[in-house]
Amino acid sequence: MQHNLKTIFVISHSTLTIILFTELVTGIIGNGFMALVHCMDWLRRKKISLVNQILTALAISRIFQLCLLFISLVISFSYPDLTTTSLIKVTCNLWIIVNHFNIWLATCLGIFYFLKISNFSNSLFLYLKWRVEKVVLVTLLVSLVLLTLNSLLINLEINICINEYQRNITYSFNSYYHANCHRQMLSLHIIFLSVPFVLSLSTFLLLIFSLGTHHKKMQQHVQGRRDASTMAHFKALQTVIAFLLLYSIFILSVLVQIWKYELLKKNLFILFCQVAYVAFPSFHSYILILGDMKMRQACLSVLWWQKFRKNYVEPLDL
């Protein structure tokens, strides 16, 4: 019985590890492709639109985030003794920065879609709609205030943790950190995650309301077909729904770690949470690629080129 349980554990652990590293690699490739397409378009046109600026910055921030997580996992799994107080402090600070821009740039993308596509006669909405670039800029500047506060609180918590550890050094700091400090870090993390989530959810609900209002107006004038505005609403809603779904999984993975903290001692549970956590920055990039005609065409061009190259090279090898 114990042998069977051990076998199941080993298989589950190996499967989750493969899934996790596959997510990381595919996420880096997807975000790298997105950044490359927009940068090449920028160089060719000598200008870049606001939405492409957001998408490029989002892709770059996620590449850094996924690379950082990849390196952290390799060190954690292969060289746990290298996890010192200094390394954890540096890793936490880097993680706060890249994760902050990942979340807030995605939120700004949702705000951009909402202001560009929604139709409201409210004077405040119209004022913001005509100043969408300033709205995005102000949102990012306000988010920097939250980043500073988040960084200060996290560093304060880490310093307290280090001081307590140095008073009683009985085992490695990595073990002490995960046993005594990691839960507080996760709690702070979820507090700062809630702000952009509420903003994204609000834009989603307002988009639905705008679509409903527009649909009623169109039913009075046009029967049996969808106009360009309705299609734009549906396209934006599909993107925002996918974003909110992945974002919800992202937040739930953190909440589960806080509520069931005793399970963090089990490597299998940690891996499962990491798989859920990484799904957001990895898969969201592919949703954005599929939702953008220019990136979708570029992706198809690459696939056709690979197919042609394979068919062309193979006869030469013979």
Curated annotation (Swiss-Prot):
Membrane topology term: Multi-pass membrane protein
GO cellular component: membrane
Gene Ontology BP term (one): detection of chemical stimulus involved in sensory perception of bitter taste
Sites carrying sugar chains: N168
Topology feature Cytoplasmic, residues: 38-53, 115-134, 211-238, 290-318
Superkingdom, natural source: Eukaryota
Presence of keyword Nucleotide-binding: no
UniProt keyword terms in alphabetical order: G-protein coupled receptor, Glycoprotein, Membrane, Receptor, Sensory transduction, Taste, Transducer, Transmembrane, Transmembrane helix
UniProt cross-references to Gene3D superfamilies, sorted A to Z: Rhodopsin 7-helix transmembrane proteins
Location within or outside the cell: Membrane
Gene Ontology MF terms in the entry: bitter taste receptor activity; G protein-coupled receptor activity
Pfam family, one: TAS2R
Transmembrane segments: 17-37, 54-74, 94-114, 135-155, 190-210, 239-259, 269-289
Residues in the Extracellular compartment per record: 1-16, 75-93, 156-189, 260-268
InterPro entries (alphabetical): TAS2R
Family, per entry: Belongs to the G-protein coupled receptor T2R family.
Function summary: Putative taste receptor which may play a role in the perception of bitterness.
Something else known: Several bitter taste receptors are expressed in a single taste receptor cell.
PANTHER family in UniProt: TASTE RECEPTOR TYPE 2, TASTE RECEPTOR TYPE 2 MEMBER 117
Protein name: Taste receptor type 2 member 117
